[in-house]
Curated annotation (Swiss-Prot):
Annotated compartments: Cell membrane
Keywords of the record: Cell membrane, Membrane, Transmembrane, Transmembrane helix
Membrane-spanning parts: 8-28, 54-74, 87-107, 117-137
GO-annotated cellular components: plasma membrane
Protein name: UPF0756 membrane protein YtwI
Organism lineage: Bacteria, Bacillati, Bacillota, Bacilli, Bacillales
Domain of life: Bacteria
Lipid bilayer topology: Multi-pass membrane protein
Length: 154
């Protein structure tokens, strides 16, 4: 019961409680319950391999709700596109999606980088009120930085 993994999760649970971070609290609680119930061997591989995609899908659904409810329609889109801020947001959305695309590959292929990114994300979520989309975009930024370093060192 008191494995290194469980102790680490309990530590994260304590950090989540102290930081009053509901997302981290929920995530760690779910993982601990899965382990306690004994379903970790069955569920963890699937969660690990598909969880990021599930998360992106849930975020996408949440973002599309105003369109589904009719709160945002073609009229609002047309009005927004007349704003310079909308064009900046459009460009930022494209840039982030392209950066994150390479981050997904990096997360899947490099456990060393994944560990550092996950710890960084946990710290940001627990201590600074960050949002746990960090590993994906963080990996994308790391990938971009690595490519720049390669450019100047090879």
């Amino acid at each position: 019961m008191f494995t290194q993994a469980n102790l680490f999760l309990i530590l994260l649970l304590a950090i989540a409680l102290i930081a009053k971070n509901q997302s981290l609290l929920f995530a760690v609680s779910v993982l601990l319950i899965i382990k306690i119930v004994g379903l970790d061997q069955k569920l963890f591989p699937t969660i690990q391999s598909k969880g990021i995609n599930w998360g992106v899908t849930i975020i996408t659904i949440a973002v599309l709700v105003p369109i589904a409810t009719g709160e945002i329609g073609f009229k609002q889109l047309g009005e927004a596109m007349r704003s310079s801020y909308a064009w900046i947001a459009l460009g930022a959305g494209i840039a982030v999606a392209l950066i994150a695309k390479n981050g997904l590959t990096l997360l899947e292929n490099d456990p060393h980088i994944t560990t550092a990114l996950v710890i960084g994300t946990i710290l940001a979520v627990a201590l600074f009120g960050g949002v746990a989309v960090g590993p994906l975009i963080g990996a994308g930024i790391a990938y971009l930085a690595m490519q720049i370093v390669k450019l100047f060192t090879s």
